[in-house]
């Protein structure tokens, strides 16, 4: 020390020489306190002068003790006291130091504290070594003296760069718990030393537990005081109980002492210093522990080649390694379960002991605490009852003391609800039971509580009362300070509850797979190719023929005329299509198509029903007025008188082919001159799309003798919600031979009820015989002139007039073999709707009718 102190004048002289270039003496004095001179002292000077001064300081070895002071307030290293220099040396990071292992307890200590270690731990067991000299002055003598008492563990070289410890945490821990510090001593890299027994980190924690690890409550008052010091809450009485409950007393059995983590707090050291000494047996056990495969982990340590002597709940080794250890009497899982059961029983006993001790301590204190509780929260009186050791409660059981198992129920709501809730105390060991789920870390919480010997609590401090600033607790951590949003919140909650309770999603029909593609058509789109399927489609449905004698009102035939672009209902279920007699009183013209037994197959397509979606956009055509609707109804009333003439003459000539079947298909007006009819596939989907309805005419085909097109156009209106149901809509449909105008009629959705558009409304038509011979399909030719205003088949060449749809989009209509004569339905029988909606028809001169090859059609009045 004298030689190092003699360097201080040299340091000041060098500093004075370096700062002599400066004119201000104060700045020169400031550099005395610094290891490197401040650049502020060299203002206006070249950098070389500062570098020279810095080199001058660095070349001179600064005194280590002064270097601790020179950092000033900005130093990053903890300074040690001078009194502890004999323990740590001058500069613990760079000094020579020696580690010794106590032969009694295998504790790794410095030689400087070996004497105090023997006095504290072992009493008069081992003769204390003479007080060590400082390692800087005489390291060899102290080393030789220590060798007689303990085996030398390691020696580190004194190099300024090599750090002696892998874990610098242990350096800092030496100041707080000196005799428990674990140094992973390594042999020196520079010079070989005495052979070093490897001190593995797995073994050292076993040796750390003091004999006071099994801290029984010697005096209950000291326990309460220590608990109050640790809990540090303003209301002292209520929080006391939980820390006392949670403090686990660690028994001295080898299973419990084994699994610690290295460092024990200094509370035990203080007890040892105060004189609470116990016997030396735990330490003899630690050094003389024998491996028991039924109690210990047993996995071989690769360094020491010895089996691990931690308990069965060892956290260092995996479960598979522990199961693979040979020599156990039972299976590892059974032993582990028994071990846990024993530990639980011990914990139950310890808690009972703690509860009885706290009951003795706190009867006087619990009185005012309960009074304050009764005054503040208005709860019922305390119930100090002891039902079972598992549910025994202290006198002030009103206080919420949830463990980690039921820590959700907090006592903060007591201020708002007006009473303090009393959560049920979980059965003792509930903390452990909640942690037993994992395979690997089964008894984590129990082991940690065994390792720690200090008082602790598993939750944050919970005050008895706090200021809520006039707020209300609406939810967990959700406080409301006013009532502005109460009604809105209530309405929203009720809406959500109604929606959840009504289960609206169950009422929406599932979308079945449809063979029809789904064109997301724009409003001005013409007929999509996906809607009209050719007859060569192999998925066309052929239903068996069934004779019907029924009155077919035209409401069956009109419903799918002009509602939406691709929304068709074709039901393949013949049992659902069995309604035979339907007649509406508002219908003026009714068709009665008698079906007799006919041998030839007849093609009938199920009527495509249309579900009008309520969100259809209004069409671009002008909406017609209600007077036009009335005009339609008057015209439909006139039609049966005109129908009586020519269909009856046609029935007389074609009476031989008496069987007739009704084929309803969509004949698109957009197809223009070459009007073709198609049979839709029987799909099972109810698909509704928002699109312009281009199909405004229905053709009722008699498969014996051709086509009697019941083609009619609905008049577009904004929302044609007709009050009479489908019967009133029928008034707008021509019963026989409607004009098939070639302009696209974009009609908005008809606001019909779902019942009117259900499959039941199409039963009678779809139950008709459905069969089709592919070889019979022909294109119909023009058989009469337009001067007579008869049915004129529109030729494919006239498609150039409209140019809206290529002819390939439409399917050819079957023409039976025996349809020889073409019957004509008169000009007056067609319901010319072209006058009712002028904007919906592009060319009124094209109001032509298809050639009718009718079978027997009787028109009933």
Swiss-Prot record:
PROSITE patterns this protein is in?
Answer: SCA7 (PS51505)
Superkingdom field: Eukaryota
Q: Return the Polar residues bias intervals.
A: 355-369, 817-828
- Start and end of every SCA7 domain? 284-351
Compositionally biased tracts (Basic and acidic residues): 342-354, 628-641
Q: Where is this region: Disordered?
A: 1-31, 154-189, 342-448, 606-673, 772-861
Composition bias type Basic residues, residue spans:
617-627
InterPro entries per UniProt: Ataxin-7-like_regulator (IPR052237), SCA7_dom (IPR013243)
The protein's matches in PANTHER family, at most eight in alphabetical order, are given as: ATAXIN 7 RELATED, ATAXIN-7-LIKE PROTEIN 1
Protein name, per record: Ataxin-7-like protein 1
Species of origin: Homo sapiens
């Amino acid at each position: 020390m004298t030689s190092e102190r003699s360097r201080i004048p040299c340091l000041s002289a060098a500093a004075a020489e370096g700062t002599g270039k400066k004119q201000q003496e104060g700045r020169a004095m400031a550099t005395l306190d610094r290891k490197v001179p401040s650049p502020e002292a060299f203002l206006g000077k070249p950098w070389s002068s500062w570098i020279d001064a810095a080199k001058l300081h660095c070349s001179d070895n600064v005194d280590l003790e002064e270097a601790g002071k020179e950092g000033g307030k900005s130093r990053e290293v903890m300074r040690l006291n001078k009194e502890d220099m004999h323990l740590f040396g001058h500069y613990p990071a760079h000094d020579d130091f020696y580690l010794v292992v106590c032969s009694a307890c295998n504790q790794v200590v410095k030689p400087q504290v070996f004497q105090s270690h023997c006095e504290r731990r072992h009493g008069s067991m081992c003769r204390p070594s003479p007080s060590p000299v400082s390692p800087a002055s005489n390291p060899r003598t102290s080393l030789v003296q220590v060798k007689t008492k303990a085996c030398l563990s390691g020696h580190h070289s004194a190099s300024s760069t090599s750090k002696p410890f892998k874990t610098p945490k242990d350096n800092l821990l030496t100041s707080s718990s000196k005799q428990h510090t674990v140094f992973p001593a390594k042999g020196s890299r520079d010079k070989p030393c005495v052979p070093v027994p490897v001190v593995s980190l797995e073994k050292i924690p076993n040796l750390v537990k003091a004999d006071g690890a099994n801290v029984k409550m010697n005096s209950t008052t000291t326990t309460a005081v220590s608990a109050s010091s640790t809990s540090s809450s303003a209301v002292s009485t209520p929080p006391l109980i939980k820390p006392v409950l949670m403090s686990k007393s660690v028994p001295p059995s080898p299973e419990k002492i084994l699994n610690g983590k290295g460092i024990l707090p200094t509370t035990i050291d203080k007890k040892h210093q105060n004189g609470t000494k116990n016997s030396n047996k735990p330490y003899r056990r630690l050094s003389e522990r024998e491996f028991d495969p039924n109690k210990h982990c047993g996995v071989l340590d690769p360094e020491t080649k010895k089996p691990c002597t931690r308990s069965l709940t060892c956290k260092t080794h995996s479960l598979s390694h522990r199961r693979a250890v040979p020599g156990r009497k039972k299976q590892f899982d059974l032993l582990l379960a028994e071990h846990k059961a024993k530990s639980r029983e011990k914990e139950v006993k310890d808690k009972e002991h703690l509860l009885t001790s706290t009951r003795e301590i706190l009867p006087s204190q619990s009185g005012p605490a309960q009074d304050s509780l009764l005054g503040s929260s208005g709860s019922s009186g305390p119930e100090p009852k002891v039902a079972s050791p598992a549910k025994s409660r202290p006198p002030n059981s009103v206080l919420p003391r949830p463990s980690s198992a039921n820590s959700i129920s907090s006592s903060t709501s007591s201020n708002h609800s007006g009473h303090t809730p009393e959560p049920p105390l979980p059965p003792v060991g509930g903390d452990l039971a909640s942690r037993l789920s994992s395979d690997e870390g089964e008894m984590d919480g129990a082991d940690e509580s065994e390792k720690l010997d200090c008082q602790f609590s598993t939750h944050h401090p919970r005050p008895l009362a706090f200021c809520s600033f006039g707020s209300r607790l609406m939810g967990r951590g959700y406080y409301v300070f006013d009532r502005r949003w109460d009604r809105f919140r209530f309405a929203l909650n009720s809406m959500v509850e109604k929606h959840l309770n009504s289960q609206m999603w169950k009422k929406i029909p599932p979308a079945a797979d449809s063979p029809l593609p789904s064109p997301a058509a724009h409003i001005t789109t013409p007929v999509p190719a996906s809607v009209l399927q050719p007859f060569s489609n192999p998925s066309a449905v052929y239903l068996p023929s069934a004779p019907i004698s029924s009155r077919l009102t035209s409401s069956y035939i009109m419903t799918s005329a002009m509602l939406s672009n691709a929304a068709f209902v074709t039901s393949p279920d013949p049992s659902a299509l069995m309604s035979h007699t339907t007649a509406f009183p508002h219908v003026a013209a009714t068709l009665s198509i008698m079906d007799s037994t006919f041998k030839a197959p007849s093609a009938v397509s199920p009527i495509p029903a249309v579900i009008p979606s309520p969100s259809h956009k209004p069409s671009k055509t002008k909406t017609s007025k209600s007077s036009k609707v009335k005009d339609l109804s008057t015209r439909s009333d006139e039609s049966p008188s005109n129908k009586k003439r020519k269909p009856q003459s046609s029935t007389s000539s074609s009476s031989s082919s008496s069987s007739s079947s009704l084929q309803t298909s969509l004949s698109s007006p957009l197809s223009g001159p070459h009007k073709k009819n198609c049979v839709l596939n029987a799909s099972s989907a109810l698909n509704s799309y928002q699109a312009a309805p281009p199909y405004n005419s229905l053709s009722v085909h008699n498969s014996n003798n051709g086509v009697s097109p019941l083609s009619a156009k609905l008049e577009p209106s904004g929302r044609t919600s007709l009050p009479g149901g489908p019967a009133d809509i029928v008034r707008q449909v021509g019963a026989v031979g409607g004009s098939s105008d070639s302009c696209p009629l974009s009609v908005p959705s008809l606001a019909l009820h779902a019942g009117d558009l259900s499959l039941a409304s199409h039963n009678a038509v779809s139950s008709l015989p459905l069969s089709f011979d592919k070889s019979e399909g022909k294109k119909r030719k023009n058989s009469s002139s337009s001067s007579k205003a008869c049915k004129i088949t529109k030729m494919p060449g006239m498609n150039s007039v409209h140019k809206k749809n290529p002819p390939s989009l439409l399917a050819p209509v079957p023409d039976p073999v025996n349809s020889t004569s073409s019957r004509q339905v008169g000009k007056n029988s067609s319901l010319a709707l072209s006058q009712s909606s002028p904007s919906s028809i592009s060319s009124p001169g094209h109001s032509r009718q298809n050639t009718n090859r009718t079978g027997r059609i009787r028109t009933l009045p």
